[in-house]
Amino acid sequence: TYLKAWDDVRKLFAATPAARKAKITPGAFSFNTPGGRCEHCQGTGITTLEMHFMADIEVPCDECGGRRFKAHVLEVRYRERTINDVLAMTVDEAAKFFADRAAVSSKLECLRSVGLGYLTLGQSTSTLSGGEAQRLKLAGFLAEEKRGRGSLFLFDEPTTGLHLQDIHVLIGVLDGLVSRGHSVLVVEHHTDFIAHADWVI
């Protein structure tokens, strides 16, 4: 939802013959608003058990079995997949699945370009590391980027928790921003990253 790709996915599901026949609108495929989502878990697919003297435990929702939506919504399929199946896909898998749908695939490619292809579409932003959250915001900018006046980007240790290969992907994305007229200021301790900087303070 952060890149607004989910709006286009919901429209694709609502345009299927099964959805039209059942008069299911795009709103029913949203896990953020009432309608088609499971109201017991409010579209999260999980419920929290309070353990009082221990840490709370998250378990699959009893009502929907962790599938987030009501049964009649889950009956609708797009290319043999339910809406929950799509939420369970990684960004990489979804990019292939929606390759011929430019409105969706272009936004997913922005996520892949910043090295977030391993995230699932239904993953909560609260589970992301600080570095992942920063790269998600960067992908959001890339999806909406307009040519012209440059912007200043500030990053606070964006390599936290990243594999060396992912760090090189991130460096490539930041180099791309600079080459298009933007400025990038980074607080960082990773020596490979620092070695790539134009200026070190």
Where are these regions (language model features)?
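Conserved phosphate-binding elements of NTP-dependent enzyme cores
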Residues: 1-201
